[in-house]
Amino acid sequence: MVAIFKDELHEQLGTWPLGYIPYGGADYGEIEAIARAVGDGGDTVFHDTWTAAADRMMIDGQQAEAKGHLTSARESFLRAACFYGKSFHPLFGKPVDPRVRAGSQKQIAAFERGLALSEPAIARQYIQFEGSSLLAYVIPAQGRADEVRPLLIFNNGYDGTITDLFFASAVAASRRGYHSLIFDGPGQGTSLVEHGLTLRPDWETVIGAVVDFAQTLSNVDPLKIALCGWSLGGYLAPRAASGEHRLAACVADPALSSVADGFRAYVMKLGATRDEAANLGAMPAALMERLAQIVANDRKLTWSVVKRGYWVNGAATLREYLASVERYTMDGRIAEIQCPTLFTLAENDMLAGGTQNFFDALRCPKTLIRFGSNQGAGEHCEMRNRSLVNRRVLDWMDEVLV
């Protein structure tokens, strides 16, 4: 693929909205213009450029609303939310950069201003969870808001925000007649930025609270509630399904049976024995130091492991982080998944290395859908062709949730 941004991390983070083009999150020309403006600039320039574009969209929305052009206003506000959400990703880390908190707040404000102009208007919800509350929105089926319909719960991964879920999945589901629930779980979005809730492996406890909430909704068929996870959500969703048996279906895009296994293979290439790699948090100091130097000398690894990983997992050191990821495993739980389950596998997705073995171990009704580069869908989460994966997943849902 031809890069749009000059910096590799900016390319990784700044091209996600390409997947949202069919759903109103962006247009190619806007992203290309932002990339040109960022040029050789650093993370501050990246942040400021995305923020300026979002600010312009907010002005467009306000002017359209003042003139009574409510559809244009809604579209502008929602697009602004997407762009605010992209602005602060390179700035992840702890202590929380004030620009991350401000960007998150602007994102939610723009998102809610757009949702308020929906038909019917959509308001924020809160899901009670262990003494705290998780931000959520219920996106109704298009033109069928009051009908009792199946509900799809969309689940983020490491660094996605609630607007990513909206544009990547919920809009498509709404068009196909499904109600959707999008939320910020522990370690995600506002739960992390505003409340400091970190990620946890026992995701069945989180989804249990989400399903409790979903079953209070008068327009939801309580027997047709499904869970769809993408990116790290490809671990979280199957993990939840292994313990929350009220789910009628589960989707993992891609499916992960272990977060640590990817690191395990890497440290063995660095010279670790199989026994040493079996417990990442207990690796010898010399090996840990070598790995730390590799991470420190790689900008993308520094962001994904130190800035994002430490913060999301509540870790202060590489050893603490690696010890924490060991807990994200499906060992002993795969046979507990009972509902029909769909796994995706994109050919160039590095996170999908164990998807086939995970799929083979399932004992529930199961489907595996492969995506290739010849479809423009061979990368992580099929971000260059989200409309294709949405068609395939929703077709499968149509058949499973009959």
Residue map of PLM features:
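Alpha/beta-hydrolase fold nucleophile elbow
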Residues: 219-231
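Short beta-strand element of the alpha/beta-hydrolase
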Residues: 147-157
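Short beta-strand/loop motif that positions the catalytic acidic residue
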Residues: 337, 343-345
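Catalytic histidine neighborhood in serine/cysteine hydrolases
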Residues: 362-378
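N-terminal cap/lid segment of alpha/beta-hydrolase-fold proteins
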Residues: 50, 54-57, 100-145
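Alpha/beta-hydrolase active-site loop
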Residues: 197-219
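Catalytic active-site module of serine/aspartate enzymes centered on a nucleophile-bearing elbow/loop
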Residues: 372, 379-402
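Hydrolase active-site cap/lid region
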Residues: 242-323, 345
